[in-house]
From Swiss-Prot:
<dbReference type="Pfam" id="PF03900">
    <property type="entry name" value="Porphobil_deamC"/>
</dbReference>
<dbReference type="InterPro" id="IPR022418">
    <property type="entry name" value="Porphobilinogen_deaminase_C"/>
</dbReference>
<feature type="modified residue" description="S-(dipyrrolylmethanemethyl)cysteine">
    <location>
        <position position="241"/>
    </location>
</feature>
<dbReference type="GO" id="GO:0004418">
    <property type="term" value="F:hydroxymethylbilane synthase activity"/>
</dbReference>
<dbReference type="InterPro" id="IPR036803">
    <property type="entry name" value="Porphobilinogen_deaminase_C_sf"/>
</dbReference>
<comment type="function">
    <text>Tetrapolymerization of the monopyrrole PBG into the hydroxymethylbilane pre-uroporphyrinogen in several discrete steps.</text>
</comment>
<comment type="similarity">
    <text>Belongs to the HMBS family.</text>
</comment>
<protein>
    <recommendedName>
        <fullName>Porphobilinogen deaminase</fullName>
        <ecNumber>2.5.1.61</ecNumber>
    </recommendedName>
</protein>
<dbReference type="GO" id="GO:0005737">
    <property type="term" value="C:cytoplasm"/>
</dbReference>
<comment type="subunit">
    <text>Monomer.</text>
</comment>
<keyword id="KW-0808">Transferase</keyword>
<keyword id="KW-0627">Porphyrin biosynthesis</keyword>
<dbReference type="InterPro" id="IPR022419">
    <property type="entry name" value="Porphobilin_deaminase_cofac_BS"/>
</dbReference>
<dbReference type="InterPro" id="IPR022417">
    <property type="entry name" value="Porphobilin_deaminase_N"/>
</dbReference>
<dbReference type="InterPro" id="IPR000860">
    <property type="entry name" value="HemC"/>
</dbReference>
<comment type="pathway">
    <text>Porphyrin-containing compound metabolism; protoporphyrin-IX biosynthesis; coproporphyrinogen-III from 5-aminolevulinate: step 2/4.</text>
</comment>
<dbReference type="GO" id="GO:0006782">
    <property type="term" value="P:protoporphyrinogen IX biosynthetic process"/>
</dbReference>
Amino acid sequence: MKREIAVGTRVSKLAMWQARWVVDRLKELCPGCSFRIVGIRTLGDRILDAALVKIGDKGLFTKELEAAMLRGEIDMAVHSMKDLPTELPEGLVIGAVCKREHPADVLVSRRGKKLDELPGGALVGTSSLRRCAQLLWYRDDLRMVNLRGNINTRLRKLEEENLDAAVLAYAGLFRMGRQDAITQVIPFDICLPAVGQGSIGVEVRSDDGEVLELVKKIDHRESRLAVFAERAFLRRLEGGCQVPVGALGTVENDRLRLEGVVATPDGKQLVRSFVEGNGGDAAAIGLRLAEKLLELGAGEILKRARQEERRE
């Protein structure tokens, strides 16, 4: 490939790390290729003084990257898959889902206490309604506090704002070399992750055959099947940052197991179940699980969540 390939990414340290990681993998497979990383500030990067639910928009961390790609300013965009809306703009596709890092949430506690050891009424920081809902379902005495910013900012605020603990994604801490901060990996039976959590995705123009062929080389089939099942599940439920939805797909011997949860933001109502099937049927499995949860009452939960969102 003769042309220089422009790789778009958000400007945070974690996003830049992920873009460099992708470029390093591509260079291994295409030593003669030339890459240039382009940092682009997104709406979600610019608004840091409000909870994600208050901003109320999908694509908070991706729209500007996608617009730049459609204008031809960049050739691919590297995303955290959990940030990428389930509906992509016309002309763009997911060219690769890289091998997934551990998708769990983790507790970072100021005094080294695990979730069950936190005092009654403990202050727990997170920007995620999904985490709030599931943790309040598990422990309704916790007091959840909005906590946004990059990893180092959140770890600093944990101390400055006198919080007892914060909940972050394992993958981000691992990639930033901050595993030392982790007090506890929260079990999946307490808190299912966000759709796509732990996965790096590469979005490309659908008509750019050269770049498509290149990025396909770093696609990890099992990760892609799991994430695509999760995204199909989320798409059917029409959930975004504003609705507490979690999911986790796992693939073993080409069998896909998908578990999902829908809850009210206050954690008072929660439905959770799973389905299994052939790995090649990822999208259908996602739809099956969504329908199953809707039958169990997820529709009413989502309706209530959206009504509360509009009132706010």
